[in-house]
Amino acid sequence: MTMHFDPTFESLRTYSAPQWFRDAKFGIWSHWGPQSVPMFGDWYARNMYIEGTPQYEYHLRHYGHPSKFGYKDICALWKAENFDPESLADRYWKAGARYLMTQATHHDHFFNYDSKLNRMNSVNVGPHKDILALWKKAADRLGMPFGISEHLGASFSWWRVNKGCDRFGPYAGVPYDGNDPAWQDFYHANQEHGTDDPGAAAPWYTQNPQFRDYWLRCVTEMIDRFHPDLLYTDGVLPFGEHWMDKQEAPDPEAYRLGLQAVARLYNTSIADHGENRAVYLQKDRRPEIFSVGVLDIEKSQLPGIMPEPWHTDTCIGNWFYDVHYPYKHPEQIIEMLVDIISKNGVMLLNILQRPDGTIDDEASFILDKIGEWFAVNSEAVYGTRPWRVFGEGETRVKIDGFTEEKTSWSRSDIRFVQKDGAVYAFLMGAQGGEAVALRSFADQPVRSVELLGAGPVPFTQEYGVLLVSLPERLPSLCANALRII
């Protein structure tokens, strides 16, 4: 067991994910901040400065022109007046979550805690509450590992558009409020990136050395203040230039500050617990990079079992509250979770909060349905490990970055996990009253089969096929689980 990490690849590649993370399987994320105020979804702080986007048009009509009413003014409107982290944490625990992720800062450079490095924070502006401290208190009461997400690394180049102006109409040529010298500490002195929108906010990470140093100071402040069990970076390990699964050889110098942050996270955990219980999540899919922590795959999955745990983050709808965006059905969320854990993954689900801090009735319904499923099937989730195969059947989830389509499962589709000598088989498409054929037990005599929530069920095993008869009424709305010994 490593008892101290140096800020080098050689040292940090000795990392191994802690037991609690391997066992937890499911967490909930509060991806929440002042961008929830307009209730118009993700990247509002950016798109409101891009002439012609729906969010720009909404902002113009609802708040006024961004030269007069900018994002700093949106931040002042955020009050979080009905935010009750204790009751929300209780709801999330009841729904099956076994860790809590909270947002320290998004690309909008607004901090959700009492920062000494950034005056634009939730104690000084808007809610006048230390959002992260309140969340941590609630998580600690329940014994839930507590995580923080930082999206700061991309902010400097992502927010170049606040330095622009309209090209057409009555405000053509009038600078947006991001040009105000009095607010450069918030909007960034990022003129070097120009003002044009490149579409994908490229480059994701700036080369600006002053901002990179500032990023490290801020992340260090987050770690020292909250001693998180998880730290999530929205991007690759800073400040790498590659994304997803590109194969270029990494330049160690580019990652120097990122490695310092990861080492501090782990060494803080060792000092607190006598061992490292912390998890670092980032999105570079090259093993030589992600082996310093745990690979995160945003809104997508993997085609097969990965030897070490991996992580998916997803949401019930948009990333920030959006009155226009439909939510996933509970069944889709549960089926995603089952497919992920069968491949050694862990799933983080963003439950959207309105600007006042509450969740809406649809989100509450989703939590209730997930909780009902966990009440029956939790033993097939917590503490399990992948089996020798992840499943049976021809249906596969669509593997495409940032794409999540509901999978149409058939009666032959099964997903497996194992624990304590039992194999759990999730029935992805089977209906009540059917007989299910499982072909992965040809060389393994079966002594008993139990349907979780219903009890023992009839089965036969011959000619390499385990045939299980299901009752007319199944206990769960989807992904019913067999316990096979």
Q: For each of these PLM feature ranges, what is it?
A:
Residues 2-485:
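Mature catalytic domains of secreted/periplasmic carbohydrate-active enzymes
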